[in-house]
Design a protein with these regions (language model features):
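Predominantly extracellular beta-rich ligand-binding scaffolds that present long acidic/polar faces
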Residues: 1-181, 189, 193, 198-201, ...
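Short coil/loop residues immediately preceding or within conserved phosphate-binding loops
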Residues: 184
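Short, structured beta-strand segments at or near domain termini in extracellular proteins/domains
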Residues: 204-205
Length: 211
């Protein structure tokens, strides 16, 4: 939980697994203020019971790149909500898992190439994003510490490493570049396991099969 305007949370190659919260709002991450930047992060299997629960939630500035949120139940307001400050998502996977909702429409800009299920209408999708609601994804389990899934023909838009980096830069001129420097540009060209991606055809989320 973060509440200070000058707080920064940078995450790279991280797994948040089976978080549980008995009350409302952020089940895995709750950021009321500040900046939250994520690359190659998997959030899997979180459970909540509060009526306003959301897996990753807050009014902070969020930047999600190459990130997977999947298999989350008891979060009636979805798996991701950026309710206050301008936030960006790029090349990320938002799967409903045992829940019924993923992206909560808020102050979100899409950097493109996201794959999502059961998102709110008007959340900010662009032409390179894919609504995957008609497809069945694998059960929410971990293999080699990451959620693995297979791309189908429904998806015909794929990010390049440079497109992801450009989206991170566009998020915030200062903080975006700081995050890139902290991760290193090469960190956007591998998946959460450290396995090289095809930098010209990257799979959405923290896992990449090497398309």
């Amino acid at each position: 939980t973060t509440t200070a305007a000058n707080s920064f949370l940078f995450m790279n190659n991280c797994l948040l697994h089976e978080n549980y919260a008995p009350t409302a709002w952020g089940t895995a991450i709750h950021a009321g203020n500040g900046y939250v930047c994520m690359n190659n992060v998997t959030v899997l299997g979180t459970t909540a019971t509060g009526g306003n629960s959301i897996t990753v939630n807050g009014d902070a500035y969020f930047m999600l790149a190459n990130t997977t949120i999947v298999g989350n139940s008891g979060n009636p307001n979805g798996v991701f909500r950026a309710g206050g400050r301008a936030s960006t998502v790029v090349n990320s996977l938002f799967a409903k898992g045992a829940g019924s909702r993923t992206i909560y429409a808020g102050n979100i800009t899409s950097g493109g190439y996201n794959v999502y299920q059961a998102a709110d209408a008007g959340w900010g999708a662009v032409s390179t994003d894919t609504d995957y609601s008609s497809q069945t994804l694998p059960a929410a389990t971990l293999t080699d510490g990451v959620y693995q899934w297979t791309v189908t023909g429904t998806i015909d838009e794929f990010a390049t490493k440079q497109a992801v980096i450009d989206a991170v830069k566009s998020f915030d001129a200062t903080v975006g570049q700081q995050f890139i420097n902290w991760v290193g540009e090469n960190g956007f060209g591998v998946d959460q396991r450290g396995v090289a991606r095809n930098v010209n055809k990257m799979q959405a989320g923290a896992y990449d099969a090497g398309l």
